[in-house]
Amino acid sequence: MKEFCNKRTIFYGGLVALILGIAGYWLFLSSFSSAKEEIMLRVDRDDNCDSIQAKLERVASPRQMLGFRILSGVVGMKKVRPGCYIAGGGISTLALFRNIRGGRQTPVKLTIPNVRTLGDLAARLSLQLELDSAQLASAFSDEALCQELGYDTTTIGCMFIPNTYEVFWNISAKDLMARLHKESNAFWTSKRKAEAKAAGLT
């Protein structure tokens, strides 16, 4: 009788463990979104846990959101870290939660277009970043910042090389300027400078 009870205890214990394992996988380890393509979640500086969940509800099912809410309640997300995070493409609910909680964001592709004015550039870049056009325009007209990079407010436009770069969505205006300055220096090799001079472009 005792042996029978032990076997029954082991059986039910194993059954409970199996059910919990399946539920855990179903809630936390399966894909957060059924979308095969990458879905970018943009977390603003004024977002909180509730507003993040509201954004995620647009791309996730109730089951996936239940897993995310359980993690938020048990583990917690005291400090919201702004940035751009992948919420599709097969990422699990647990991985997405860890990325958002830890601030492990995904870089975005920033395209520098051919435009006529710095105002146009600020407007176009603001569509791709958290920065708004006013913040970008302010950086472009910041005399001290421009001088620090070797330009002035009338020549700073020469620093922006039309191309596509990877940057963090919530990059600051100053860090963006420093990054584009680095890209400009990398572009203008001695050979390119000589070619530009020969063509009368400098």
What are these regions (language model features)?
Residues 1-202:
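Conserved catalytic or metal-liganding residues and their short signature motifs at active sites
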